[in-house]
């Protein structure tokens, strides 16, 4: 199952700036928190799905000017309706109440650890990772500061983004 919440995407000329890095950071935070919530549901008795995730896709299908906050799940056999209900309920809970400061802090730490790992492994980076970064830059207006600069900037950004800004972003996406 897929649920798409279509939205305008950040214009390419802004996506190439620090605004693009901030947007990507907040997207990663939102996806991380939603994925953690879905994982909690998976650990309850009789979850309706086998797998669920949420993410923001800057290219909704083939539309270059639209993005989509996407909530997806692999339903258990005979559980499509309850899976859909669970996804919608969880999304509506986020829309109504947002994320908690403790959820944000856990996600912030996890995202920063991922960047730290990429930074520490920068000398072992495979060529295809560079290719993807450059293709994204030219096709979607992404930024290419390199992991050293990205890691430094992200550590500064993460300290200055409050949970309220993250909540405003996700509410704008699923509005």
Where are these regions (language model features)?
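Amphipathic heptad-repeat coiled-coil/leucine-zipper-like oligomerization helices
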Residues: 169-173
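Divalent metal-coordination and catalytic microenvironments
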Residues: 28, 87, 166
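Active/ligand-binding-proximal structured segments within catalytic/core domains
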Residues: 3, 15-34
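M16 family metallopeptidases and their MPP-like homologs
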Residues: 1-18, 38-163, 175
């Amino acid at each position: 199952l897929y649920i798409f919440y279509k939205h305008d995407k950040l214009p390419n000329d802004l996506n190439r700036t620090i605004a693009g890095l901030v947007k990507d950071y907040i997207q990663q935070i939102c996806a991380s928190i939603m994925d953690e919530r879905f994982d909690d549901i998976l650990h309850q008795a009789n979850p309706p799905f086998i797998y669920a995730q949420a993410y923001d896709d800057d290219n909704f299908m083939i539309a270059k000017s639209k993005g989509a906050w996407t909530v997806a799940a692999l339903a258990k056999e005979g559980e499509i309706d309850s899976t859909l209900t669970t996804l919608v309920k969880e999304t509506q809970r986020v829309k109504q109440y947002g994320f908690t400061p403790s959820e944000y802090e856990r996600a912030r730490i996890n995202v920063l650890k991922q960047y730290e790992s990429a930074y520490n492994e920068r000398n072992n980076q495979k060529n295809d990772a560079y290719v993807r970064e450059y293709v994204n830059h030219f096709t979607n207006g992404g930024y290419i500061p390199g992991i050293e600069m990205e890691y430094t900037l992200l550590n500064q950004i993460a300290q200055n983004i409050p949970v309220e800004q993250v909540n405003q972003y996700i509410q704008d996406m699923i509005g």
